[in-house]
Amino acid sequence: MSNKGIQSIRGFSDILPEESPLWQYAESAIRRVLESYGYREIRLPVLERTELFSRSIGEVTDIVEKEMYTFDDRNGDSVTLRPEGTAGCVRAGIQSGLLHNAEPRLWYAGPMFRHERPQKGRLRQFHQVGAEVFGIPEPELDAEMIIMTARMLRELGLSDVRLQLNSLGTPESRAAHREQLVAYLRRHEDRLDEDARRRLETNPLRIFDSKNPQVQQVMADAPRLMDCLDSVSAEHFTVVRNLLERAGVEYEVNPSLVRGLDYYTRTVFEWVTDRLGAQGTVCAGGRFDGLVEQLGGRPTPAIGFALGLERLVALLEDQGTPGQGGAPHAYLVVATEAGAGLEMAEALRDALPALRVQMHAGGGGFKAQLKRADRSGARVALILGDDEQAAGALTIKDLRGEDGQQRLPLDDAVTYLRGLIGA
């Protein structure tokens, strides 16, 4: 029996306290933008019936065939840890009646699960912020959603990401394209690898995603879905592009962009970067006008996207973005009875709700407490001894700058701390 402590499961990572501030910064910025566009939060379960994903994502996709965490519960029902958020959001919208006679704008956040090979930017438990809008078929909404994602990336200071667009048309135009694509690939089948040959029989559009250079050469000359678009889808895509250009959002049309989920129709988009190696997609989305009906609801047009938080945080970390929260602003050194320390800490929080103040606990002399204050990362130590308590004052010791040490009446100490935190 090993005497090693229990380790986390491969591909499931802890987000440690020193990492959390950057996550909080990213999540807060994204939430602010979503709310400014009228989106409301919905909180969804991480466990759903397996049928939900096989019906929505597609039974012959890599996700359903190879990547889902699926098991039978004690009742013998097949259940799955969610690999993405859209299907659950649609299910909740149908079940609750949210989609009936309404045009809800919803957002959600949380962990998703896929049994993939862990690598940089790809974990088996990963986190997304997603958003969906239901009931609006017009291309203006496609453009607004893409413009909103551009605003999110600007708010986070990310400039080296590129927008790629494509249109997948309707199921009918995809069927016409599939016929042409299969005929082309049959002529070049000897140049396809085993995975591409398998997809040729099940889901040939996914061969555009191949990372094999030889297969990529074959696909470079393959029939393009865009050339098979029906006139309504083509006009829809033209309007989206024109609106993005009017808004100053730069993009490139990528005919090979097909997305990994079967439910997409018409507009699809991705924000990509070269700074994350092979896992360069930071945000992706598109229309799914048939999914609500497919899952048992009324015919309802819809569009959505998801942002990958691990990849977003990696970009922020790489460019040196400071996080939100983190270390305390002040560390309260208590050189008098503990009750007075508790009262002082609460009084400071009442006066300055934005102040992060950590009170010393666990015993130790004055010097030991100051060492703990320094190690905490706090900018100042607040010293409360018998003299300070009697005088209604605090001694403030600057731990990071050149202000030295000064005793101030409590009101003046609050003013000093207000300036310290910019409140």
From Swiss-Prot:
Gene Ontology molecular-function annotations: ATP binding; histidine-tRNA ligase activity
Catalytic reactions on record: tRNA(His) + L-histidine + ATP = L-histidyl-tRNA(His) + AMP + diphosphate + H(+)
Top-tier EC class: ligase
Broad class of where this protein is predominantly found: cytoplasm
GO cellular component: cytoplasm
Keyword list, A-Z: Aminoacyl-tRNA synthetase, ATP-binding, Cytoplasm, Ligase, Nucleotide-binding, Protein biosynthesis
GO biological process terms held by the UniProt record: histidyl-tRNA aminoacylation
Cellular location(s): Cytoplasm
Entry EC number(s): 6.1.1.21
HAMAP family found in the cross-reference section: His_tRNA_synth
NCBIfam families per the UniProt record, alphabetical: hisS
Quaternary structure and interacting proteins, as annotated: Homodimer.
Protein's name according to its UniProt entry: Histidine--tRNA ligase
The organism of origin for this protein: Halorhodospira halophila (strain DSM 244 / SL1) (Ectothiorhodospira halophila (strain DSM 244 / SL1))
Gene name per UniProt: hisS
